[in-house]
């Protein structure tokens, strides 16, 4: 079906708030671009690159009355009456799949490859995770996902239980299973993420070892040898009491979705119960790991 595209230009600092505003008025998807048209393939809420000049692009159903949409947006404090925007009709495309040509097999660490399900694996003898992210987040293209995958690849997961807190596409949980974990548990607030994780687990032959839960459905008590949470700095701080009880004594914790500038505040929330390793940075993002005391 055809779509209507609404484009706003803003600062990187305001991009997330305006993306929320577009979703509230009916946008079915959001894309972020800098002024040089560099796409963000994995725009997790809060994980946008902080470009100085950012386009926020919303797609709307072709039947949407855009006059009503604009009228509502004019009341937003970051926009105001007569805000600058561009609306255009788009031809019928599969917008959710348009990026597929740019998604190639990627290696993380020594053993692990993440391969799009529509491409051939470059090394059949490697640990290959075949991935189709669908509508969920997590392809390995984002630095935070990459940091988590590299960490998992460096662990001895044989026979271990792993919890993926905020599982998205299931990429981290499935990678852990392919790397030798006996069992993985994925938790996410988004039903689409649960479905994408389930589909990807089936594609990789690990469905029987992956449990998936929405927060309201998860067991009261869960424990794991390894816990990885690639979400956001704010939730990582707020949910520290919940996340901290998940690893067993001596268990490992890996946290990402954190800007390097936010590392100290996140470390502070976990340092009482964990012996933390040096923070690892990639671009402006970082990974925090540690062992349960």
Swiss-Prot record:
It is an enzyme of class 2 (transferase). GO terms for molecular function: protein-lysine N-methyltransferase activity. S-adenosyl-L-methionine binds at residues 145, 166, 188, 230. The keyword Isomerase does not apply. The keyword NAD does not apply. It catalyses: L-lysyl-[protein] + 3 S-adenosyl-L-methionine = N(6),N(6),N(6)-trimethyl-L-lysyl-[protein] + 3 S-adenosyl-L-homocysteine + 3 H(+). Keywords: Cytoplasm, Methyltransferase, S-adenosyl-L-methionine, Transferase. Disulfide bonds: none annotated. Pfam families: PrmA (PF06325). One of its GO terms (biological process) is methylation. It is found in: Cytoplasm. CDD domains: AdoMet_MTases. Its EC number is 2.1.1.-. GO terms for cellular component: cytosol. Belongs to the methyltransferase superfamily. PrmA family. Methylates ribosomal protein L11. This is Ribosomal protein L11 methyltransferase. It comes from Enterobacter sp. (strain 638). The gene is prmA.
């Amino acid at each position: 079906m055809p779509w209507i595209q609404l484009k706003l230009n803003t600062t990187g600092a305001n991009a997330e708030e305006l993306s929320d505003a577009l979703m509230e008025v009916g946008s079915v998807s959001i894309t972020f671009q800098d002024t040089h048209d560099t796409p963000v393939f994995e725009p997790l809420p809060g994980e946008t690159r902080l470009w100085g000049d950012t386009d926020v692009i919303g797609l709307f159903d072709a039947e949407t009355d855009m006059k009503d949409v604009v009228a509502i947006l004019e009341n937003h404090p970051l926009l105001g009456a007569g805000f600058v925007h561009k609306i255009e009709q788009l031809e019928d495309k599969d917008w959710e799949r348009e990026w597929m040509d740019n998604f190639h097999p990627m290696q993380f660490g020594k053993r692990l490859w993440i391969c799009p399900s529509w491409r051939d694996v470059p090394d059949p003898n490697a640990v290959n995770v075949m991935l189709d992210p669908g509508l969920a987040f997590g392809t390995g293209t984002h630095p935070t996902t990459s940091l988590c995958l590299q960490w998992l690849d460096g662990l001895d997961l044989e026979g271990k239980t792993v919890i993926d807190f905020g599982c998205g596409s299931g990429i981290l949980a499935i990678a852990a299973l392919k790397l030798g974990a006996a069992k993985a548990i994925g938790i996410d607030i988004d039903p689409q993420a649960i479905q994408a994780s389930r589909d990807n687990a089936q594609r990789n032959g690990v469905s029987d070892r992956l449990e998936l839960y929405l927060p309201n459905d998860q067991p009261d008590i869960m424990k794991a040898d390894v816990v990885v949470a690639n979400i956001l700095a704010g939730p990582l701080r707020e949910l520290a009491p919940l996340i901290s009880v998940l690893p067993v004594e001596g268990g490992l914790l890996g946290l990402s979705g954190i800007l390097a500038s936010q590392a100290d505040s996140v470390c502070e929330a976990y340092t009482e119960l964990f012996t933390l390793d040096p923070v690892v940075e990639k671009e402006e993002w970082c990974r925090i790991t540690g062992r349960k005391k």
